[in-house]
Amino acid sequence: MARRGRRSLASPAVAIALFVFLAYGGGGGGGGVCEAAPASAVVKSVPGFDGALPSKHYAGYVTVEEQHGRNLFYYLVESERDPAKDPLVLWLNGGPGCSSFDGFVYEHGPFNFESGGSAKSLPKLHLNPYSWSKVSSVIYLDSPAGVGLSYSKNTSDYNTGDLKTAADSHTFLLKWFQLYPEFLSNPFYIAGESYAGVYVPTLSHEVVKGLHDGVKPTINFKGYMVGNGVCDTVFDGNALVPFAHGMALISDDIYQEAQTACHGNYWNTTTDKCENALYKVDTSINDLNIYDILEPCYHSKTIKKVTPANTKLPKSFQHLGTTTKPLAVRTRMHGRAWPLRAPVRAGRVPSWQEFARGSRPSGVPCMSDEVATAWLNNDDVRAAIHAQPVSSIGSWLICTNVLDFIHDAGSMISYHKNLTGQGYRAFIYSGDHDMCVPYTGTEAWTRSLGYGVIDSWRPWHLNGQVSGYTQGYEHGLTFATIKGAGHTVPEYKPQESLAFYSRWLAGSKL
């Protein structure tokens, strides 16, 4: 079947366009910066949104491997402020295997998405006042191939892992900057959440290695951000029990029994006594929404929706998760991390469908991605954003079921130490009510790097209110929490997220 995607990077049309731009210095115009971008990448309008786009948008494919036809899909949102000077940020969602349109649709993209009324009807789009494109240009990348709208003509490419994903994403960046050379002078950052706690440091490592090796084009890489990200088997695996105790989800007796039986080692149980103690922990928290313990958990359409008033949350928590988001937080929290007490381990990573079958007969709880699914599987939307049609590459899924993924990068501790040791800035943040990748583990591993504290633990504020807590270290490392937020921080606390994002990019203290 004929494909409707963009021409490959090697096409004469693109080569001529780049030559003309470089030879004659094509400048900005019309409020944007991308004058060299191929015309086939321009997004003129998006179905579901009435009115002019708030900035220039571009989308399409970059072929990272010609022989196999391995193509990664991106969506670029130019900064609404000053795209010629503002930072450029690559955004990656996790999984592994989950689409970065998760971030575009539900978190910090240019639009807020409102359901069209049924599962297949086109959603209504409204401008997002807290979009991260207010202060930066953002590239949303579906990676690796097989995720979201990215694909390969050779399905053997869907057998992949951390290191291959990082290499492909680096190839993507090098080719992308050839298409958009205007951005080479902009400060460039890599950001992501959840399993992107692996994607971000490994890709950052590839970029820095390329800079050391003199690879062209030269990327103006400055640093990276990780939100509620996985990092290390031990730190991640031991985080849940102290978190649950600190949040009053388990009693002192249960906590002390687990401590005594497991000797503080909760992730790799070796005795029946420890396993029995952890079973009591799991039983106490099993009905909560692990991605945000403040949010109701919807198990399926056949089960009546619950409210915070009849969950196991202490009454004092019931209003902590209030949000300024104009539309309701989605009812699904599946797709970006792990089941309880299942830290990242070396070797093959189970697919989300396998996790679902292994956890509950009805599938993974707290899930409903109808808005994103309806929009991204609409034929007009696919055409508008230059994505291959459903008839060609299949339906968009929030998390793919085609990957056979290997975690082969090991602990991220050494990556963080290496990158920050070379002077690259790092912002590590946690929604403090995420039980999937709890802040307790993240705070512990950032502290374990051994850097001196230069900004002692303190609250950070927005509009005169405490929005979370932060601690700054040597070598440009910052740890921060966001009060009342879950696993996908901008989804719950969009205003606070734009605040910490813009402050950190500007080099200001939170």
Swiss-Prot record:
Record-annotated disulphide pairs: 98-399, 262-274, 297-366
Glycoprotein in keyword set: yes
InterPro entries assigned to the protein according to its UniProt record, in alphabetical order: AB_hydrolase_fold, Peptidase_S10, Ser_caboxypep_his_AS, Ser_caboxypep_ser_AS
Catalytic site: 194, 434, 487
Motif (Microbody targeting signal): 508-510
Propeptide residue range(s): 26-36, 303-362
Pfam families: Peptidase_S10 (PF00450)
Recorded catalytic activity of this chain's protein: Release of a C-terminal amino acid with broad specificity
Keyword line: Carboxypeptidase, Disulfide bond, Glycoprotein, Hydrolase, Protease, Signal, Zymogen
Signal sequence annotation: 1-25
EC number: 3.4.16.5
Glycosites: 154, 268, 418
Record-level Gene Ontology MF annotations: acyltransferase activity, transferring groups other than amino-acyl groups; serine-type carboxypeptidase activity
Keyword Glycosyltransferase in annotation: no
Any one biological process term the GO annotation gives: secondary metabolic process
PANTHER family: SERINE CARBOXYPEPTIDASE-LIKE 20, SERINE PROTEASE FAMILY S10 SERINE CARBOXYPEPTIDASE
Family to which the UniProt record says this protein belongs: Belongs to the peptidase S10 family.
Record's protein name: Serine carboxypeptidase 1
Organism listed in the record: Oryza sativa subsp. japonica (Rice)
Gene that produces this protein: CBP1
